[in-house]
Structure formats: structure tokens, C-alpha cells
Amino acid sequence: MKRFRFLGFIVVFCAIISWSIAIAQPIPNPPLWQVYQQSLKSAKYVDLTHTITPTIPVWPGFGQPKFSATTDPKTGKAYTYAADRFEATHYDLPTDQLGTQLDPPAHWNPDYPAIDELPPTFAVRPLVVIPIQEKVAQDPNYSLQVRDILTWEQQHGRIPEGSVVFVRSDWSKEWPNPKLATLTDFPGVSLDALKFLHLERKILFHGHEPLHTDSTPTLEGEAWLLRNGYTQAEGVANLDRVPETGALVTIGYPKLQGGLGGYARYIAICPPNWGYGVSVGQIPEAPLAKAAKSLHWDRQLGVRVR
């Protein structure tokens, strides 16, 4: 009897030891979490987006946005931190074609998707940056040509299928000068280059710094893209702060029903050793750091400032 009790004790003891060893073993992270820990966490993040303000450059045919304090519809009084413990902002945006954008094809063709109908697979892609700023410095009306793309590929290799291609012109360095919206000469992307990128390299979409694809009288490049079901990015910023190859881009925008334009947020995810950007852990995130000055409403500017 004692022998059986002893054997039972041994079995239970071994089971406990095995269980203890099992729970002590670290559970491997799922593959995508490993990608975050090993690559994305130490990467450098660069914002490629303009801030929307009441004075940003806007095509004159749309008019300027206006900001105001949100009011209680019953009393007409603005919400305040002192009286209501919160404040909010009312935005009078004359168009969804404003600032840094993602153009859905429905902007020119109602048979294709609007902004809320774009697939979630747009969220993150390889980023290619093709520089033409030196040629633009000589000719403000210069447009990306197929030869510029081939020259880039000779140095960096073939453009990845499904990637996003941004064209660096440094046009955005004068942002937010209002005159940018009235210029008739500005850098663009030629129709031949657009067709090559989409039909030969099968990219997801391209992006440019100006508010239009090209300066042709009929906007031939934009017309071809949107009428044939392609999207494009406009008003992209800070392309001088991202590498020409090796980065990713995240793509975010509000999901407005039937939207014919998209206020977009583009973030470049660059290699850890890149000279620009910020990495996870370098600045407070949760909680975020308090600012040196509090936000307040500036009546003259018509916007909250610090």
C-alpha cells in the first residue's frame, strides 16, 4: 500500500514539475508581433502630411476652410473647459479636396469607389521615392518622365509591385504660402510615366507634392488615373526626409460616405539608422507629455494655438 502511495506521490510530483517547466517557458510572439518588436519598434517614423489650417493653400474654386468653437445647439454658447470641462471644434471645410489627400477614382468617375469604399489593404505598403527636385529647380514645370523611373531603377532595382511611389520635387517647401494654390507652373507627373508605373510596374498608387497631377490644360494625367479606377496622393510633404528605397508608408484617412476626396495622413516608416524621424520610446506616448503652453482660441487667426 505504501508503495502505491509513494508511486502516486512521484506521479503527482513529476506532473507538477512538468507543469512548472511548461509555464516557465516563454510563449513565442506571433509572427506579426515579432515584426513589430524586431523592426517596427526601432524604425524611424516621419510624417509626410501637412497640417490643415484656415490659411492653407486651396484651389480658389473651393474657398478657404473656417474653424470655430463648437456650440451647444440649444443655447448657442461655445463649450468651454471652465463651464463644461471640455471643448470641441467646428470645421467648415468647403471641400474634401484639401491639404494632403488621397484621391479616390470616384472624384472623376462615379462608377469607381469613393473614399469609404477603398479596401483596407491600402493600409501599409513599400515606399519608393523618385527625386526630380534638381530638374524642377531648372524648370518649375518639369514632369516626371519614364527615363527618370528607369534611372532610379538602375540604381535601386525594380520598383516593387503593389508599392506606393512618391515623386519628390521639393515644391512643398514653400507650404503654406497661399500663392501655391494659384501657380500655373508647377512640377508634375507625365501621362507616360503614370501609365508606365501602373501598367508596367503594377504599383498601388503614386503621390506628388503639388495639389494637381500635372499642369496640362485638361489635367490629362489625373483624368487618365481616376477615370480608369486608380487612386493618387496629392499634397505630400517632407519627401526630402525619407530614403528613396527601403521604407514603408502607412496610409490613413477618414471614412466619409460617398467621399470624393480624402484628408489623408501618410507616415513613412524608415530604417532604424535613418537620419530623420522618431522611434517608439523616444518621446512620451502613454501618457503623452504636457505642452509648455495651453491651447487657446485665437480670434484673429480663427484657430486654436499654444
Regions flagged by a language model, labelled:
Residues 8-18:
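Bacterial N-terminal signal peptides
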Residues 22-306:
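Active-/binding-site microenvironments in catalytic and ligand-binding cores
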